[in-house]
Swiss-Prot record:
Zn(2+) binds at residues 298, 302, 311. GO terms for biological process: proteolysis. Residues 19-181 form a propeptide. Its cofactor is Zn(2+). Glycans are attached at residue 223. CDD domains: M35_peptidyl-Lys. Optimum pH is 9.5. Active from pH 6 to pH 10.5. Stable from pH 5 to pH 10. Inhibited by chelating agents such as EDTA and 1,10-phenanthroline. This is Peptidyl-Lys metalloendopeptidase. It comes from Grifola frondosa (Maitake). The active site is at residue 299. The gene is MEP. SUPFAM superfamilies: Metalloproteases ('zincins'), catalytic domain.
């Protein structure tokens, strides 16, 4: 009895003493001549008293993928144009991954430094030369050792200021979409999987469009993923699906060279028709929740000509919450479109 009580008290004391914490600092040059020289380092430090196993979320400061990781503003409040990639990523699924580079483990007092080439993600032409404040996204996910589920944690953030002059954008070659479908670095089995996924995605989009055309009032399926019904939001989603339905998914160009184990896929929104597939994509089913076909719907909605959706929330739970709390963002969130199309579990 005494030993059981002591074990319980010790466990409680450990739980009470655990105090996770992070700090996030952006550092770099005070001035650059040309955005090709605008490279900054994010330093993530464990300021708590327990080791943290952090997800290498491609949206965040731990990852080098050119996503919209930074809030960048000049003295007039203007921001550069984002020209990087939009990604499908599900933290709860990444947490279960055994692939390499999915996590960053940081002990108390230790730091991780990551370099970011901002010219790969931002074009400063519209906002112009000037002094900019650079602040990195400060939300992270650590793995709860008790549940093995991701838990959000916000880091104390320190921004960096730099003066940008000279060349304000880096011109990069834009791949030309050819027909029929082209593959880069895809095995024969991957090509077969992509053909099946493209066909299923085409069906998903066609069915979704038909549903939206015939349901012009609140329904369980609509409100689950896009929130309270008003005609303007319905029209926004309808236009997205009208645009996506004009795509021939089987003529997309697919690149299979991405090795990020926890990521499904990504696209450059202004490079219509090219989809880059990553590690998590190949472990997904053809159809169903977070499927290969659904991933193609997600990524196609990111293309500017299809509506240019964002990544405000990832995963079914977060997407449902977004629909409830902020339907204006839900109708512009890629995962909400994917889950509406997958319709799993089925709703009328």
């Amino acid at each position: 009895m005494f030993s059981s009580v002591m074990v319980a008290l010790v466990s409680l004391a450990v739980a009470v003493s655990a105090n996770p914490g992070l700090s996030l600092k952006v550092s770099g040059p005070e001035a650059v001549d040309g955005v090709n020289n605008l490279k900054v380092v994010t330093t993530i430090t464990n300021t708590g008293d327990e080791t943290l196993k952090l997800l290498n979320d491609p949206r965040g400061a731990l990852h080098t993928m050119p996503t919209d990781t930074f809030a960048i503003t000049n003295e007039s409040g203007e921001t550069p144009s984002f020209i990087g990639v939009k990604v499908k990523y599900v933290p709860s699924m990444a947490a279960k991954s055994t692939g390499e580079n999915v996590f960053a483990v940081i002990a108390p007092g230790q730091s991780v430094n990551v370099e970011h080439d901002l010219s790969a993600a931002y074009n400063f032409t519209s906002s112009g030369a000037g002094t900019y404040a650079l602040e990195a996204l400060n939300v992270f996910n650590y793995i709860d050792p008790e549940t093995n589920e991701p838990v959000e944690i916000w880091a104390d953030a320190e921004a960096h200021t730099t003066a940008v002059s000279g060349k304000l954008a880096v011109v990069r070659a834009t791949p030309t979409l050819t027909r029929p479908v082209t593959y880069n670095g895809c095995s024969s089995s991957e090509q077969s999987a992509l053909a099946a996924a493209a066909s299923a995605a085409q069906s998903y989009v066609a069915e979704s469009l038909s549903y939206l055309q015939t349901h012009t009032a609140a329904t369980p399926r609509y409100t689950t993923w896009f929130g309270s019904y008003i005609s303007s939001r319905h029209s926004t989603v309808l236009q997205h699906y009208t645009d996506m339905n004009s795509n021939d998914f089987s003529s997309y160009s697919f690149d299979c060279t991405c090795t990020a184990a926890g990521t499904f896929a990504y696209v450059y929104p202004n490079r219509f028709g090219t989809v880059y597939l990553c590690g998590a994509f190949w472990k997904a089913p053809t159809t169903g929740t977070d499927s290969q076909a659904g991933t193609l719907v997600h990524e196609s909605s990111h293309f500017t000509r299809n509506g240019g959706t964002k990544d405000y929330a990832y995963g079914q739970a977060a997407a449902k919450s977004l629909a409830t709390m902020d339907p204006d963002k839900a109708v512009m969130n890629a995962d909400n479109h994917e889950y509406f199309s997958e319709n799993n579990p089925a709703q009328s």
